[in-house]
Swiss-Prot record:
One of its GO terms (cellular component) is virion component. It holds the Pfam family Big_2. This is Ig-like virion protein. Its main location: virion. Keywords: Virion. InterPro entries: Big_2, Invasin/intimin_cell_adhesion. It is found in: Virion. Residues 89-149, 176-253 form the BIG2 domain. Coiled coil: none annotated.
Length: 258
């Protein structure tokens, strides 16, 4: 059943007649002292200022009441469960998507489908099996904070605690390449001489730093596409280009073969 929250107040409210108890408002307040109206020290029948409005919103009337223990700190929050015998209960909760993958720093949104469609209380509470990696922000929104697999996202109905689940995988955030710089920028070599280009990809923490090399004139100088090793073949000048796999960023080294 749905739960509401009230603040503890020192008011004492008189009990209503037993004949009016068609609904029961119950709640757990561990550590509360037993009173004359409590069958169990951890169970309370309560009514307090502000509670009437909340019950009215649920189309219920407050019934049994008891003394709010004045020895407890004023402002202490107590969760109250409302029992409605006429409610149409939730039978299933289905979370969509049932599997999802996201990256660190992203926010993903899930939805919960409640059956039957005319269930009285359709609200759900969202949670994850690892809040340090996937933190629930409410309303099915999760903040992805760290890499993880097999994380269970749950939607629990406030009526009956029916649970729907989805599985979430979180991968490292992709850091895009913004540029590449070849070194040296110019080079003079003899025929048959070799040297290897160095490529610096920016930013330093880019996810994919792969660079491919090409020669504008292989007859003058060749280059190994993977390693960047250049070899002079004939006299002349040739441009050797390095291009990143991510973003197609380029830089050029001008090679003179003498």
């Amino acid at each position: 059943m749905p739960k509401i929250k009230i603040l503890v107040t020192p008011y004492v409210v008189k009990n209503k007649p037993e004949t009016e108890r068609n609904h029961v408002v119950t709640g757990v307040a561990d550590g509360w002292e037993k009173t004359s109206l409590n069958a169990d020290p951890n169970e309370i029948l309560t009514e307090s200022k502000g509670l009437d409005t909340l019950l009215t919103d649920c189309n219920l009337k407050p019934d049994g009441v008891t003394k709010i223990d004045p020895s407890k700190p004023i402002g202490k929050e107590v969760e109250i469960e409302i029992y409605d015998p006429d409610a149409i209960p939730v039978q299933t909760v289905t979370v969509s998507p049932d599997t999802a993958t996201g990256t660190v720093g992203q926010q993903l949104t899930f939805t919960a489908d409640i059956l039957p469609a005319d269930a009285t209380y359709k609200d759900v509470e969202w949670s994850s099996s690892d809040e340090a990696k996937a933190k629930s922000l409410g309303n099915g929104v999760f903040d992805l904070k760290a890499v993880g697999t097999g994380i269970i996202v749950s939607a629990t109905s406030i009526d009956g605690g029916v649970i729907g689940e989805a599985e979430l995988t979180i991968t490292a955030a992709v850091v895009a390449v913004t540029g590449v710089t070849l070194s040296p920028k110019t080079k003079t070599i003899a025929v048959g001489e070799k040297f290897t280009l160095a490529a610096t990809v920016a930013p330093a923490n880019a996810t994919n730093k792969t660079v491919t090399y090409t020669s504008a004139d292989p007859a003058t100088a060749t280059v190994n596409a993977t390693t960047g090793e250049v070899e002079g073949k004939a006299s002349g000048t040739v441009a050797i280009t390095g291009k990143t796999a991510d973003g197609n960023k380029t830089d050029v080294c001008n090679v003179t073969v003498s």
